[in-house]
Amino acid sequence: LNGGAIPGTIENLKDAAAGENGEWTKMYAEFAKVAKEEGFDRIAYLFEAVAKIEKEHEERYRKLIENIENGTVFEKDGEVYWICQNCGHIHKGKTPPKICPVCAHPQGYFQVRAENYK
């Protein structure tokens, strides 16, 4: 795999996105087609549902690539709440701190806080 070399993050994300694309456009589509032909409608439905999930994965990877290439992983246009995934420290700003002031973990531990529980 990769001649023993470890690819960079963007290359890994591109490979992952391509893999997800093949899964939702070819693999699960073909599985669903065969299941329908064989009269397994429920199984065909499940394969189609999984294909939609794989499509979402591809889109997520492509958005991550875009964020890395545009330098927006840790920089947003407006102020947002960032949460440290190690200790839970919350920081409000366009960027998270370089080092968490509570647990001293690096910036890579921060992500934009989701508020899907409200």
What are these regions (language model features)?
Residues 1-118:
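Non-heme di-metal
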